[in-house]
A protein has these predicted regions:
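Non-catalytic, solvent-exposed segments at the cell envelope interface
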Residues: 3-311
């Protein structure tokens, strides 16, 4: 596990949600957490005993492959991050869920958790996370590859300091490409970097030559969320229509339009550098050796950790 403090995950999804006018308020039935009926269940998850706090809420952030190798109805989620926001204490917790985690799926059977969305869109992804982790999700925000590119370009790029270079000779050349199954070489050097939307996507998406494998990518994704948050502080309600046009409906969310203004105002109050916990489920919380290159969860360790922060 990596547990760190910072400032930013909360405000990442707020501008994304606020400018998703064309896809805002999509109805998604979010059931209460419950054990899945399966004769081969590895465990029976129970809802967290953490008490509900007035005004607090949990959002599932989903970042998808939506490039030309996939149809719009069958995309994987390269990124799944639970965000818990407690306005009364200005506390935020971000939990990165490994995309290769081998779990029971809400639609039936077992598979990598990144496939849940492809079988049943947001409702299936939400139900799978709820049922395995025993948490209650209030809302979701989904963003595709082009959506991330356009969002970051619309706010003028982001600034990060990379601790290690990202060098990938097998990065998919599948965004706006005539040859979606080809590869290209990408590089993001170590040190201070100003990233455009395309280079930021390369930074968070690359999964080759990282000594920490997919866990390193999870840490990079959270780092980019923090950088987006820095730029998002400059966004005012008057900027939202132009940003919405730039995204061109490439964000989907269950957060209704009438909530966005109050949420943007709330986000501006989260300026404490210690306001957010960042959690990545490194070994021994997970371990390799699962079917098809998946990783296995150690629920005896994961669930107590998750239920410290997520009801």
């Amino acid at each position: 596990m990596v547990l760190a403090s910072g400032s930013g995950g909360f405000a990442y999804f707020l501008p994304a949600a606020a400018i998703a006018f064309g896809s805002t308020g999509q109805a998604v039935n979010v059931p209460s957490p419950s054990a899945m009926a399966s004769p081969s269940m590895l465990f029976t998850p129970s809802p967290s005993a953490l008490p509900q706090v007035k005004g607090a809420f949990t959002v599932l952030l989903l970042g998808s492959d939506d490039d030309s190798k996939f149809t719009s109805d069958h995309v994987l989620t390269q990124s799944m991050i639970l965000v818990r926001v407690v306005p009364s204490t200005k506390q935020v917790t971000m939990l990165s869920i490994p995309r290769d985690l081998y779990v029971p799926l809400s639609t039936g059977g077992y598979g990598k958790i990144d496939g849940a969305y492809s079988y049943g869109r947001a409702a299936a992804a939400i139900a799978t996370v709820q049922q395995n982790f025993g948490v209650k999700i209030n809302d979701y925000v989904w963003i595709g590859l082009l959506g991330l590119i356009h969002l970051i370009d619309a706010i003028g790029g982001i600034d990060v300091v990379t601790s290690n270079p990202v060098l990938d000779d097998y990065y998919p050349a599948d965004v706006n490409s005539r040859y979606p199954f080809s590869y290209q070489r990408v590089a993001v050097l170590a040190g201070p970097q100003h990233l455009t939307g395309t280079s930021a996507l390369q930074y968070v998406r690359s999964r080759h030559n990282d000594l920490q494998s997919d866990f390193g990518r999870s840490q990079r994704q959270q780092q980019v969320l923090l950088a987006i948050r820095q730029k998002a502080k400059q966004i005012s309600p008057e900027d939202i229509p132009a940003l919405a046009a730039a995204l061109n409906n490439e964000v989907k969310t269950s957060i209704s339009i009438d909530r966005t203004a109050s949420l943007v105002a709330l986000a501006s109050t989260f300026d404490n550098p210690d306001a957010i916990r960042q959690i990545v489920l490194l070994p021994p919380y997970t371990h390799g050796g699962g079917p098809g290159g998946s990783i296995n969860p150690n629920w005896n360790l994961i669930l107590p950790l998750v239920h410290q922060y997520f009801p």
